[in-house]
């Protein structure tokens, strides 16, 4: 009979995280919600695609709402009460994601738009001709 292997090392303890940062990346095709602690370590994430939406439905406001609710539900179980929101991108799920975060019971202390805007940097892609 094989010897039983003893586990060496310390198990990760569940930390109580009272304050965090919610990063919402809203593109035209998808919405990704990532929740970190104040140091930047990821606690939970969700996206419209991970919630079961496919194709063009991923870019809808309802998909963004569902993704935000799923991500927030996990961190509320870990004890988070307040969060700052960093929102980036031009997508249609921006406002809906913020409303969903607030409705899920997470207190919002700050909303900051961190959408990168070039100071006339790279040449944009040519316009579509449909």
From Swiss-Prot:
Keyword Electron transport: no
GO cellular component terms, A-Z: chloroplast; ribonucleoprotein complex; ribosome
Gene3D superfamilies: Ribosomal protein S11 (3.30.420.80)
GO BP terms: translation
GO terms of molecular function: rRNA binding; structural constituent of ribosome
Subcellular location: Plastid, Chloroplast
InterPro entries the UniProt entry points to: Ribosomal_uS11, Ribosomal_uS11_bac-type, Ribosomal_uS11_CS, Ribosomal_uS11_sf
Keyword set, alphabetical order: Chloroplast, Plastid, Ribonucleoprotein, Ribosomal protein, RNA-binding, rRNA-binding
Subunit structure: Part of the 30S ribosomal subunit.
Family: Belongs to the universal ribosomal protein uS11 family.
Protein name: Small ribosomal subunit protein uS11c
Encoding gene (name): rps11
């Amino acid at each position: 009979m094989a010897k039983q292997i003893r586990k060496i090392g310390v198990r990760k303890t569940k930390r109580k995280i009272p304050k965090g940062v919610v990063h919402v990346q809203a593109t035209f095709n998808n919405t990704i919600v990532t929740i970190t602690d104040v140091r930047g370590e990821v606690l939970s994430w969700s996206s419209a695609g991970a919630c079961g939406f496919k194709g063009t439905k991923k870019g809808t406001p309802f998909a963004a709402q569902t993704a935000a609710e799923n991500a927030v539900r996990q961190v509320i179980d870990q004890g988070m009460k307040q969060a700052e929101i960093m929102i980036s991108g031009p997508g249609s799920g921006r406002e809906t994601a913020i409303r969903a975060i607030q409705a899920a019971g997470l207190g919002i202390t700050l909303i900051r738009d961190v959408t990168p805007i070039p100071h006339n940097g790279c040449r944009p892609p040519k316009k579509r001709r449909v």
